[in-house]
Design a protein with these regions (language model features):
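DnaQ-like (DEDDh/DEDDy) 3′-5′ exonuclease domain used for proofreading
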Residues: 1-67, 72-125
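Flexible, glycine-/basic-rich loop-and-beta segments that form/coincide
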Residues: 177-178
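Conserved Class I SAM-dependent methyltransferase catalytic core
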Residues: 106-170
Length: 178
């Protein structure tokens, strides 16, 4: 049977990553906190994939709103990785473009996949885990630019359901030339 699905090199591994157990715990830093005894707010610092896994037990279906600002995959240098492209050789190996004898199985004229696959594999497990935290009427807001918006929309449709999409809010960042 044929089915419609959005897939990429590394998708199966990203599902495994989302479900991989973690052996860490969150530790409160009371001395660094403001009004620790009076506030109900949490500031959590750490790898966001690990933190999302840790929050599953205490906050499953309890979060009303999530805001994320993932890397935009622009290739620029930031504190975090913002360049999720594979080399052409890495992409050919992982996509099955060649058989075990080195024969080309198909001609991939669209090399775009190698620039987007790693980014999709980075965001997918995080969105799967974020979905588990949301209440039935919870919402997620995601900041993104034009580099990955189409892929993000497809992943969100899969993870959250197409019918749950509300809107895209565009922000004008600079005047166009002309």
């Amino acid at each position: 049977d044929e089915v419609y699905e959005f897939t990429w090199v590394g998708k199966k591994a990203s599902i495994i990553e989302a479900n991989k157990p973690i052996r860490k715990t969150l530790r409160p830093c009371k001395e660094e906190s403001v009004n620790w005894d009076n506030t109900e707010n949490l500031y959590i610092e750490g790898d966001n994939l690990e933190v999302l896994k840790l929050l599953q037990e205490s906050y499953l279906n309890k979060v009303k709103m999530i805001y994320i600002d993932p890397p935009y995959n622009t290739g620029n240098d930031f504190i975090y990785n913002d360049d999720f492209k594979m080399t052409e050789k890495e992409y050919a190996e992982e996509s099955g473009e060649f058989d075990e004898d080195g024969n080309r199985m198909f001609r991939n004229t669209d090399s775009n996949g190698r620039f987007h696959s790693d980014w999709c594999s980075m965001i997918y497990p995080r969105l799967l885990l974020a979905r588990n935290l949301l209440t039935d009427d919870g919402v997620i807001f995601i900041s993104i630019d034009d580099n990955e918006i189409e892929n993000l929309k497809k992943i969100c449709d899969e993870v959250f359901g197409e019918s749950n999409f509300i809107n895209i809010i565009s922000v004008k960042t600079k005047d166009s030339a002309g």
